[in-house]
């Protein structure tokens, strides 16, 4: 499975890391994903969601 939020679709971004001497190096920014057990349609599913969606209560967390 890829590192993508299943709620909002947020994924990895690529770009350049720029040092003080202006040397550009490729790097990847990854989303802060959390595995959450939730109940969807009467079934318990484990989904990957970003911390922003978890904070926003888009999906209720099953305890």
Curated annotation (Swiss-Prot):
<dbReference type="GO" id="GO:0003735">
    <property type="term" value="F:structural constituent of ribosome"/>
</dbReference>
<keyword id="KW-0687">Ribonucleoprotein</keyword>
<dbReference type="GO" id="GO:0005840">
    <property type="term" value="C:ribosome"/>
</dbReference>
<dbReference type="InterPro" id="IPR026569">
    <property type="entry name" value="Ribosomal_bL28"/>
</dbReference>
<protein>
    <recommendedName>
        <fullName>Large ribosomal subunit protein bL28</fullName>
    </recommendedName>
</protein>
<comment type="similarity">
    <text>Belongs to the bacterial ribosomal protein bL28 family.</text>
</comment>
<keyword id="KW-0689">Ribosomal protein</keyword>
<dbReference type="InterPro" id="IPR034704">
    <property type="entry name" value="Ribosomal_bL28/bL31-like_sf"/>
</dbReference>
<dbReference type="InterPro" id="IPR037147">
    <property type="entry name" value="Ribosomal_bL28_sf"/>
</dbReference>
<dbReference type="InterPro" id="IPR001383">
    <property type="entry name" value="Ribosomal_bL28_bact-type"/>
</dbReference>
<dbReference type="InterPro" id="IPR050096">
    <property type="entry name" value="Bacterial_rp_bL28"/>
</dbReference>
<dbReference type="GO" id="GO:0006412">
    <property type="term" value="P:translation"/>
</dbReference>
<dbReference type="GO" id="GO:1990904">
    <property type="term" value="C:ribonucleoprotein complex"/>
</dbReference>
<dbReference type="Pfam" id="PF00830">
    <property type="entry name" value="Ribosomal_L28"/>
</dbReference>
